[in-house]
Swiss-Prot record:
GO biological process annotation, one example: cellular response to heat
Region (II) residue spans: 407-598
Protein name: ATP-dependent Clp protease ATP-binding subunit ClpE
Transmembrane segments annotated in the record for this chain: none
Biological role stated in the UniProt entry: Could be necessary for degrading proteins generated by certain types of stress.
Any one Gene Ontology cellular component term annotated for this protein: cytoplasm
SMART domains assigned to the protein according to its UniProt record, in alphabetical order: AAA, ClpB_D2-small
Cross-referenced Pfam families: AAA (PF00004), AAA_2 (PF07724), AAA_lid_9 (PF17871), ClpB_D2-small (PF10431)
SUPFAM superfamilies assigned to the protein according to its UniProt record, in alphabetical order: C-terminal UvrC-binding domain of UvrB, P-loop containing nucleoside triphosphate hydrolases
Inducers of expression: By heat shock.
Entry superkingdom: Bacteria
Binding-site list for ATP: 152-159, 481-488
Lineage: Bacteria, Bacillati, Bacillota, Bacilli, Lactobacillales
Domain UVR, first and last residues per copy: 359-394
Length: 748
């Protein structure tokens, strides 16, 4: 067995100890053992200052072993071949090595000097936080309890306030009491790390506080200050970092600046004694205009880092688009993310040279040149010399101003599209054509509902132009009418026209939400109930895909509490789920369908019905099913009229196109004569049932006949459906053409 230190000599010394209840063994040779015995264990395994546990290498596995062995009698703890009996208790310490490395200060070891970073110009400019910085300075200028805590939502710029304070100290723009102060950010995780033995953390905290008292020029900054509550606690006592700091915080011996979020500040509020020693400073989210100012202040830093240029339009777009489309984050953080990510994406288009690859190629060329020179092949040596010159020029090449890429508003829009799946850029490019042709495109697929299509197209135009409220959904409509007239079909086609795919539609059948507790299915279960950790079906899907159409079928079947929940969505475009997250519906289109009230006016449905009177009658019946405040929040209540025979003839063509699309997979094509179409309408016409009976009629008279004919004659691919003896018959196209030619009868 070789020595674990030098890995050369044979290990003749075996040391045993117990660390954290586990038995550890070190195998050393005689020389290495003498070095450790004399106190020079820093030479072994790079252990550093093992006696106090503050090693430069905190993850060294031998630190705790050396700490445990340091207090033992080495003469009794080692033997040449047989393991000694483990000794309890601590003996006197061995002589210290005078050449041992002196430990760094606690603040230097566990902290980062923000003031020094400000002197070197390494922090970004702090813009628009003068009031918060002024408030922090006022609290720090107090005699006691001079410990400000910055609280605010994630990403609003709490840490930037502390950096602004450090910059003001460097500039001398602070009161006399704060002159020459040093703002040092303390890493609580590193402070707790390596304190596995009871009492080590308390000793380390005491040394830290003693050092701060001696220096008397330290303002300690703890990010995520709620971590000090319970930090270092053994679990069976209250001796954590928060309790250790309480006396010093109350007497003003220690100046502390903290930062935490609103939710996590509640952890500190639970400890009233700790909370009273701190003075909260609220950091609010900046406005869009303030965010633009902040972005312009840090613009140069990101341009230098990414080697790009930002246009003024890109800066403004980053603020406006992030505020409009990114809902889960806060300004200015989400706007800075757009700036940074767009710069990163554009930076990848630059053709930078890998320095390591160039150095490797230069070294290879140097070697080959020397070999050619020694071989007196001077022509080849000259070739490698020229190659080295070109490589060095390439190594020193810098991107000129003309080659620097420029980030425009279009680049910012692309980043927003990637993050939110909302086609921001396409909205502007295709908006005019889409809005002009929206009604015609919908009428091509939804037959007989021209009035309803025109109303919804006008409402969407108003919303797109910006005449609607900014926080309301794109549109909210209630489709009312008898069954089978195209209410759901219009919603599908609308999703396809607006969002490019009918899959963007989020559909709910409200017959599944007839119970009071079914509200939890939409927004999530309340705390304490099964399924609390799971997200709601509605809120989660909208949060993941905010640009979508929400279809609520048969809304009158839903429980009243479910409809009450939609009052806030229709009015304010927002809803809070069971987890407390606010979900935005500003980019959603909400459509609800209902046939409520149509049963009482069926007698007036038909060819000669007075449409004006029927409309008033249906809308009047809705009051029996929906509350006035619910109906009053829609952008429009659209009634669908019953379908006429002429409408069904057009619908037959659409349904037959679907049949041809299905059988086209087998290379079959079907042609239907006009007489057969009229027969299908006669068989499937029912004013009270709409177009659904027509689908069943086509299935029975067309699809079944095609299946029978194709099974008997699989070689025929061109089929025709004609009316023969008042029956619809499927035959081969060529055969049908020959018969009609002989009889001189028109095909249709």
């Amino acid at each position: 067995m070789l020595c674990q230190n030098c890995n050369i000599n044979e290990a003749t010394i075996h040391l045993y100890t117990s660390v954290n209840g586990q038995k550890k063994q070190i195998d050393l040779c005689q020389n290495c053992y003498q070095i450790m015995k004399s106190g020079g264990q820093e030479a072994l395994f790079g252990a550093g200052n093992a006696s106090n546990g503050n090693s430069d290498e905190p993850f060294n596995p031998f630190n705790d072993i050396f700490s445990a062995l340091h207090g033992q009698d080495f003469n009794g703890a080692a033997s040449t071949q047989t393991p000694p009996t483990q000794t309890g208790g601590r003996g006197p310490r061995g002589p210290q090595n005078p050449r041992a490395k002196q430990p760094k200060g606690m603040l230097e070891e566990f902290g980062i000097n923000i003031t020094e970073s400000a002197r070197r110009g390494e922090i970004d400019p702090v813009i628009g936080r003068d009031e918060e910085i002024k408030r922090v300075i006022e609290i720090l200028n107090r005699r006691t309890k001079n410990n400000p805590v910055l609280i605010g939502e994630p990403g609003v710029g709490k840490t930037a306030v502390v950096e602004g304070l450090a910059q003001k100290i460097v500039d001398g723009d602070v009161p006399q009491k704060l002159q020459n102060k040093e703002v040092i950010r303390l890493d609580v995780v590193s402070l707790v790390q390596g304190t596995g033995i009871r009492g080590q953390f308390e000793e380390r905290m005491q040394k830290l506080m003693d050092e701060i008292r001696k220096r008397n020029d330290v303002i300690m900054f703890i990010d995520e200050i709620h971590e000090i509550v319970g930090a270092g606690s053994a679990g069976d006592g209250n001796m954590d970092a928060g309790n250790i700091l309480k006396p010093a915080l109350a007497r003003g011996e220690l100046q502390l600046v903290g930062a935490t979020t609103l939710n996590e500040y509640r952890i500190i509020e639970k400890d009233a004694a700790l909370e009273r020693r701190m003075q909260p400073v609220k950091v609010d989210e900046p406005s869009v205009d303030e965010t633009i100012t902040i972005l312009r202040g840090i613009q140069a830093r990101y341009e230098d880092y990414h080697h790009v240029k930002y246009t003024d339009e890109a800066i403004e777009a980053a603020a406006h688009l992030s505020n409009r489309y990114i809902q889960d984050r806060f300004l200015p953080d989400k706007a800075i993310d757009l700036l940074d990510e767009s710069g990163s994406k554009k930076n990848l288009t630059l053709k930078f040279v890998d320095p390591e690859d160039i150095n490797r190629r230069i070294a290879d060329a140097e070697t080959k040149k020397n070999e050619a020179t020694q071989a007196e092949d001077f022509e080849k040596a000259a070739h490698f010399r020229d190659q080295i010159t070109k490589l060095r020029e390439l190594q020193n090449h810098e991107v000129s101003d003309d080659e620097i890429p420029v980030i425009t508003e279009k680049d910012i829009e692309q980043i927003v599209e990637q993050k939110t799946h909302i086609p921001v850029g396409d909205l502007k490019e295709k908006e005019q054509t889409q809005l002009i042709n929206l009604a015609d495109d919908l009428k091509a697929h939804v037959i007989g509902q021209d009035e309803a299509v025109d109303k919804i197209a006008k409402a969407i135009r108003r919303s797109r132009v910006g005449l609607g409220k900014p926080n309301r959904p794109i549109g909210s409509f209630l489709f009312v009418g008898p069954t089978g007239v195209g209410k759901t079909e219009l919603a599908k086609q609308l999703a396809k026209e607006l969002f490019g795919s009918s899959e963007s539609m989020i559909r709910f059948d409200m017959s599944e939400y007839m119970e009071k507790h079914s509200v939890a299915k939409l927004i999530g279960a309340p705390p304490g109930y099964v399924g609390y950790e799971e997200a709601g079906q509605l809120t989660e899907r909208v949060r993941r895909n905010p640009y979508s159409l929400i279809l609520l079928d048969e809304i009158e079947k839903a429980h009243p509490d479910v409809m009450h929940m939609f009052l806030q969505i229709l009015e304010d475009g927002r809803l809070t789920d069971a987890q407390g997250r606010t979900v935005s519906f500003k980019d959603s289109l909400i459509i609800m369908t209902s046939n409520a009230g149509t049963g009482k006016v069926e007698a007036s449905v038909g060819f000669g019905a007075a449409r004006e009177g029927r409309t008033k009658s249906v809308l009047g019946q809705l009051g029996d099913f929906f509350s006035p405040e619910f109906m009053n929040r829609f952008d429009g209540i659209i009634e669908f009229s019953a379908l006429s025979k002429e409408n069904l003839l057009k619908i037959v063509d659409l349904m037959l196109d679907e049949v041809n699309e299905q059988i086209g997979r087998n290379d079959i094509h079907l042609s239907v004569t006009q007489a057969a179409k009229e027969k299908l309408v006669d068989l499937g016409y029912n004013p009270a049932m709409g177009a659904r009976p027509l689908r069943r009629t086509i299935q029975e008279n067309i699809e079944d006949s095609i299946a029978d004919f194709y099974i008997e004659h699989p070689e025929y691919k061109e089929l025709v459906a004609d009316l023969i003896d008042d029956k619809i018959v499927i035959s081969n196209q060529a055969q049908e053409t020959a018969e009609t030619t002989d009889e001189e009868v028109p095909a249709e």
